């Protein structure tokens, strides 16, 4: 997803009252990370990042602790990562990442959202060559020397570093997530959000009218309780 479009979406979402949906999604991400890699954040970089993302979104500590506790409970839900690919209006490409304890419900909901909003679900694997899987870290702006920071992080797997008026974005290959996460923490950078994202290899520009049509689908997807992230090839 193009950076300009990301910022447009972020500013739009900031105006919406999404906390009632956001906190459960953040809790689910924490629970899955803890279940997959252990409940000790010091030994689990994905859990550390999930916790940092939750804190950056003002999620209460009690909620965070409860999500970690649920992961180690005997009766914890079997939450699965589910991935869907599709097309939106005007041919925009869409990848949807979900976390769900009921895949049957999730696939029915996702297919319905696509079909009712001018899109269609594609066979998984159809868009694999159109996107690159990257470890992406969204951080508070850095006041120091960016060139020096870039050099310091290259050995940890840094591929791209970009700072704008709102934030610093650091990315690398998805396999470097843990190493990059540790290097960023060692530098004392303030994390806002981190995770594995799908970045379009060839972003496409759309008109404002077309974007308005496409966003109807994206909004509905993001509102679904099982949807964790939505990626597009929009520039």
Swiss-Prot record:
Alphabetically, which GO biological process terms does the record hold? regulation of DNA-templated transcription
Q: What is its main location?
A: cytoplasm
For this protein, the record's Pfam families field holds:
TACO1_YebC_N, Transcrip_reg
- Coiled coil spans: none
Alphabetic keyword roster: Cytoplasm, DNA-binding, Transcription, Transcription regulation
**Molecular function (GO) terms listed?**
DNA binding
Localization in the cell? Cytoplasm
Q: Which GO terms describe its cellular component?
A: cytosol
Q: InterPro entries, per this entry?
A: Integrase-like_N, TACO1_YebC-like_2nd/3rd_dom, TACO1_YebC_N, Transcrip_reg_TACO1-like, Transcrip_reg_TACO1-like_dom3, YebC-like
| Superkingdom in the source lineage | Bacteria
Q: Give the matching PANTHER family.
A: TRANSCRIPTIONAL REGULATORY PROTEIN YEBC-RELATED, TRANSLATIONAL ACTIVATOR OF CYTOCHROME C OXIDASE 1
Similarity annotation: Belongs to the TACO1 family.
Q: Protein name, please?
A: Probable transcriptional regulatory protein C8J_1116
| Organism of derivation | Campylobacter jejuni subsp. jejuni serotype O:6 (strain 81116 / NCTC 11828)
